[in-house]
Amino acid sequence: MKKIARAVHLWIGLLFGTILVVLGLTGSALSWMHELDKILNPGLLQVVAPHGLYPGDSMRVAPALVQSVADMLVRDPRYGQPNTLGLPARAGDVFVATYRSSPGHVEAPWTQAVTRHVMVDPATLRVTGERNWGELGLSRAMLMPTLFHIHRYLVAGEMGKVVVAITGASLLLTILSGLILWWPRMARSTIWKALTVRHGGSWPRFCYQLHRTGGFLVAPVLFVMALSGVYFTMPQWVTPVVNAISPVTPKNKSVNHGGGPAEHILVGAAITAAQQRFPNGRVTRVSFPPKGVDPFEVRMRQPAELRQGPGATRISIDSGNARVLGVVDPQQARGGDKFLSWLFPLHTGEAFGLAGRIFISLFGFVPLAFFTTGLVTWLKLHRGRSVAYKNRVEYRQIERA
């Protein structure tokens, strides 16, 4: 068993180790993505706070203001109706309108899709700037989006997302094989040896012990990071497994029940309907219906939600009569739905507040540490075997002489 586990552990490390290092390091930076993005791009993402509020204060945006921003964009021939509109969460933030590629445009599987982001000042309705989300670059405006697309897509579109999912699945196998290799005999001395790290005057020995003991100690966190990463990129791989253990509610697309293309409510009415359903929630994003018969999709964050930022509450609003068609409420989730709703807050660390985010940002260096210590250990063993093989060959040549 250990021989097979050793081979699996070795080859996964050699094949996917570099990708895991890249994902870990980019994840460390993305733990503070929005904060760093604002620091790098103050003119694009920060404006003067509304009267009576200090920069950074939490704020709720009135439906009338959302309607005013949407109307301004529709009237301007440079923009038109956006696909989604992100609302400012704090005083000093901007609206972010997104425009996806035209419906007829087809991206190659390895091509990174590009979305146009337009930022709007809530107070003046002035466009502060725009950028193409998905384009790569190291400029101040493109640095954080580039890191995001490396982390999620390896800058290779849908094909890169599959590679990331396979890498996450390989990490799960690495954890399992590593635990098999770590497992000591049930004796006090061997258990203590498996749980301690000593230098002993040898760096290769230190690297081996650090790799072995450290791997055991961080295995639970690595497991959560790997499983959640696979779920974010390929949910169809994870959801059936979770559903087999605990029921997961099927995701059915909502359809308007009343009215037609000619009868269409405004976005402000959709926001009002969502706020009436969750009076204490804060609207964070609204998706506009691409066709007249499709509903609005409003995203909110409720006060007690684990997920920070945009939250995970979703409300489908009939675009013909403003009735609520469907609700996804993470605070009422049960079983498999509850488990899946926990994955993102655990992956980012925000489930445990600021301390959790700091921990995850530091944890992003763990793959680099394991790749380095594992490589040092393997090279030492490989070199030792090569020398032993060379000595055996020379000995046989001497015997024949």
Language-model region placement:
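Conserved histidines in hydrophobic membrane contexts and catalytic metal-binding motifs
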Residues: 1-401
